[in-house]
Amino acid sequence: MKRILKKAGILLLVFLLGTAGTALLLNSESTDNRSDFNDAVFPEVMVDMNDTLINRMYGYAQPMQADFTRDSVTPLDTSKKLTFKVNPYDSEVKSFSYEIRTSDGSKVLENKKIKNLVKEDQYLSVDVEIGSDLRMNQEYSMQIALELDEGTAYYYTRVVSRSQVHASDYAAFVKYFYEACLDKESADALGSYLEPQTTGAATNYSGININSSLSEISWGNLAPQLCQEGIPVIKEINETTASVVLEYQLTSQNDDEKTELYDVKEFYRMKYQDTRIYLLDFQRSANQVFDGTLPVYEDDGIILGVRDKNVEYMMNDAATVIAFVQEGDLWSYSPGNEKVNQVFSFRKLKDGDFRDSRTQHDIKIVRVTDEGDIDFVLYGYMNRGSHEGYEGIAVYHYNRDKNVAEERAFIPVSESFEFLKKDLEKLSYVNEKNELFLILAKNLYRINIEENSSEILEKGIKNANFVSSDNNDHAAWLVSEGDEKGNIKEIDFDTCKTRLIAPQKGQRLRTVGFMNEDLIYGMLNKEDILTDEEGHKSVGIRILRIEDFEGNVKKEYRKDGLYITDISVGNTLIEFELSAKSGETSYVAQKKDTIMNNKKAAANTVKIELISASRTGVRVKLVFNTTKQTDSPLTMYAKVSSSDRKDIVLDTQIPQETAYYVYGQGGLDGIYTDPAKAVLRADTLGGVVLNRTQQYVWERGNKKTKMQIDTEGIPESVLQGTYDIKTLKKSLKKTGTVIDLSGCSLDSVLYEISAQRPVIAKTGADTSVVIVGYDEYNTWLYDPVKKETYPYGMNDSTDLFQKAGNVFITYIETVNY
């Protein structure tokens, strides 16, 4: 009997130890049934600028639209020679070929193939000498193609011929600056570059800038270590200034000696003068990569760590599961069942590199069910897996029971992430019938995921007239063509039902936005659309209406004698100006007013809270009511199941039309149809404006100290000084594009003179001059009546043009290749 009891006791002990060991293993090491993604195979390509590597390029799996891919700018000196370094990793590079295209991609100017690549350490080196006659100060698209065993990988940069741009000096300075920040002793030398302003606020490492203190610039108490070094990427460069972006990774040890990972992005705007580099602007954002194994769980929420406060998140109706996106990764947390799941990530747990950790993609959470399943849309650059190197849109369904993210559909596109993001932020929604709705290339698409088919619901939608609800299940737009032109069309994407709102006779409608699921739109009369002397339109709304999909009016707002302008729609508040007409040309604001959202918050509302700690500074926390059951939930890693269906191919070629692209602070900021608004925006950013053919329309800080244009080369229609846009367009025909810069400052429009473009300037009711030159003290003005050129004081010129309304008209010559 004793032997039996002893044996039973031993078996019980073994069982208990085994159970405890298994539990310990699960909670401390987590269950790493990671994704089925293949490792990245595409090499990286970089430019070697005087022994400093710049402009790291990642491979695309298909040719891209040249005019919608501007990842970097590579300057050319008079030799037009470039050295490229290829990091092949584990791939065999069979050949290197390149082609130079006009930046709109319409014409190939040069193409060559190079088979003999020279091996230098871990890199392959290629020397290129461009033979084409390239125009100065004109961007061209350079496409590089690497022939691999896996196929062809494409790489893109813009090349531009500009003299004395000091590119290698700027790149070397950026590397010196960021490395010095990581060493407290070396960082002491950086103080002269900063413009610190004492605010008393807690350090926020996701928002460091040139006004931060030296201690904050040098990482305060975080004590980080460099994990993945950065390579400078030139975004803008000219004879005076340069803008450079640097991305790298850091690690830091928390109080428990556990490792935190941070993605860091820095922006530098610099000026080279008198053999020294001056820092004009500096911005740094550090964002923590979420790690479910760290101690981030509290009774009332979860700490996401150092990051910006604009969190993409969603909680299910039962308030049992919350999903959130951080640094390109999707996570879900279930406080009640003690689990945290990494639903989707391109990152490798170990032995990763920048190819898998690159965050040129984003995730839109569509739905979180009571069972914890998640529908989401992934869009942007695909770091690895079966779609490696594609820009595209993927629809996923995460099944929590299986712990698998199942790909339902994939749509490749040929525009870069910057442009794709502008469209997908407007609309990306999947209904419960497995239909995906997108805005792409100004078309509203419905994609049937089950049938792998697509249709266009509406063509030619203008972004300014399109609005969608917060969760994207409703949208509305102003119809711009056909029998329904001038109507507002609204759609419920869950039912696919639409309704029309028609204006009364003499009335006009404007879409404004959504409050909850209710449409906000404005009503005005034809005479409320005012046009000033320069042709700029302004709109005053008489009645603002909030209406549900069934047409029930929730709120109607009007103020007799006043017009609603400058409307801003937030989650809980509509803010606007009440304005009066100033003659028949403009509106003048009289006072502000608001409309509150009276809908009560749901019981499962999630709040974003900022907390602070001495080591990490400001951190972001998601606060909710669900109580956690453990301080150490089980961390799970979902597998990814790729679809075996064919890709859904849409026509994503963006229509040819006049557009002005504002680039600033390291990326695409906005797309404008009004060049004056584009210049005003670029001026605030310290950026540039390019047109559709990628000509420089305007650049901040690249104005020569003096310039004189020979009037002999100026078209007669311009010398006549007419500021009638239609007349100018007719006379210039195909030789140039008229650019209306009315509303800009004289200082801004003098850039056009610097670029040898004359500017027509209004001086009175029926008088004008043509600005043909300037120096430090004067403008040089051509009188169309006397046909004489004379100097006029700079301050007097500023005053003269301001009194006439700052009406400036110029033109940019058509490029003939």
Place the predicted regions along the sequence by residue.
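Short loop/turn segments that connect beta-strands within beta-propeller blades
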Residues: 335-338, 399-401, 448-452, 492-496, ...
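N-terminal Sec-pathway targeting helices
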Residues: 1-16
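A short hydrophobic beta-strand element
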Residues: 140, 235-251, 372-378, 519-524, ...
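Core segments of small alpha/beta cavity-forming domains
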Residues: 40-99, 104-108, 139-222, 296-339, ...
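Conserved active-site-adjacent core of cysteine acyl-enzyme catalytic domains
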Residues: 708-817
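Exposed beta-sheet edge and beta->alpha loop/turn motif
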Residues: 241-279, 283
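Surface-exposed, charged secondary-structure patches
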Residues: 16-31, 67-83, 94-114, 119, ...
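Beta-propeller fold detector
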Residues: 110-113, 282, 340-349, 405-413, ...
